[in-house]
């Protein structure tokens, strides 16, 4: 009997269970996410909206399988069972920008009970440019601004933007054999980043992107008007040349862009602080004690990124926030 109840768990079932609770007890809203990594992210979001009347419980879609991803959340017999007591939370990937071209895109964009990131994935939020300096401070305990992260990510986005439009265009055409997501990411990667001259790696990327653009524009000259129309459409959806990094594959932005610049910056900030400790120490024992204390206070930058919530100030996040507020308004 318990097994059948689990298999048939739905928004209506949870609603019925809520009604059996004492009047002052808070109602539970189950929020299914794609993987373990998503649990903390969505918990930090829903915590801002909970009150004395209800709370969210963030869960994986199955306790019998390690299956991950959007398909597991939406297609594992959950779609028809979602409602005011059960919601799904997914990374948008390209589905937000595909605007209903695929069945998954339609389901994500049209369902009132599916919350999407709008940014490609949670990693994009974790790499929100305006929060990167603070992340470095938390990781190194050094507030020296070595790099203008906002300017760097803006320039990166401006370079990637025209090729990004083509990448989504190929997805809409369902022609990934010619220009896949992997192909696109290979052109907008960063090579070794210099803390003193971070723009150099962007210049190398700019050269790769422009060469590929010339090739695509020549091969698909009939699509140029459609490409220009997509730029206008994307502007309406919130995608601009300045924030394109928020809509590029999240893992790529984290590993091949943000970490490429954050790692050398954090290393430099730590060395700077260590040199300061060495300079101010009156003797070797004090130096060793202070250095040990400092090292114990350090945090890996990738861990800091996963915990920071500076992205909540981003315009892209405001779209998700609006969806949650409208959902809560409907169920009250």
Name each model-derived stretch:
Residues 1-332:
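Acidic, divalent-metal-binding catalytic cores of TOPRIM
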């Amino acid at each position: 009997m318990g097994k059948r109840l689990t298999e048939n768990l739905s928004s209506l079932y949870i609603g019925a269970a809520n009604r059996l609770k004492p009047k002052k007890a808070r109602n539970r809203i189950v929020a299914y996410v794609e993987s373990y990594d998503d649990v903390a992210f969505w918990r930090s979001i829903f915590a801002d909206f909970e009150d004395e009347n209800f709370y969210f419980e963030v869960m994986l879609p199955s306790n019998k399988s390690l299956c991950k991803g959007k398909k597991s959340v939406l297609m594992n017999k959950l779609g028809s069972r979602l409602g005011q007591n059960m919601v799904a939370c997914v990374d948008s990937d390209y589905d937000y920008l595909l605007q209903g071209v695929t069945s998954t895109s339609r389901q994500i964009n049209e369902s009132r009970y599916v919350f999407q990131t709008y940014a490609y994935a949670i990693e994009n939020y974790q790499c929100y440019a305006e929060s990167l300096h603070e992340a470095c401070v938390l990781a190194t305990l050094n507030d020296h601004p070595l790099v203008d992260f906002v300017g760097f990510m803006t320039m990166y986005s401006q370079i990637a933007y025209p090729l990004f439009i083509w990448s989504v265009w190929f997805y809409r055409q369902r022609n990934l054999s010619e220009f896949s997501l992997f192909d696109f990411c290979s052109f907008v990667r960063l090579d070794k980043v210099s803390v003193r001259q971070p723009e150099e790696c962007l210049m190398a990327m700019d050269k790769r992107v422009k060469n590929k653009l010339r090739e695509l524009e020549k091969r698909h000259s009939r699509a140029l008007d459609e490409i220009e129309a997509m730029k206008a459409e994307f502007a309406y959806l919130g995608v601009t040349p300045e924030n394109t990094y928020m809509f590029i594959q999240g893992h790529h932005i984290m590993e091949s862009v943000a970490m490429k610049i954050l790692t050398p910056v954090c290393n430099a900030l730590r060395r700077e602080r260590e040199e300061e400790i060495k300079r101010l120490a009156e003797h070797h024992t004090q130096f060793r004690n202070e250095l040990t204390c400092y090292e114990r206070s350090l945090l890996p930058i990738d861990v800091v990124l996963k915990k920071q919530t500076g992205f909540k100030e981003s315009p892209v996040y405001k779209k998700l926030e609006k969806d949650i507020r409208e959902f809560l308004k409907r169920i009250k």
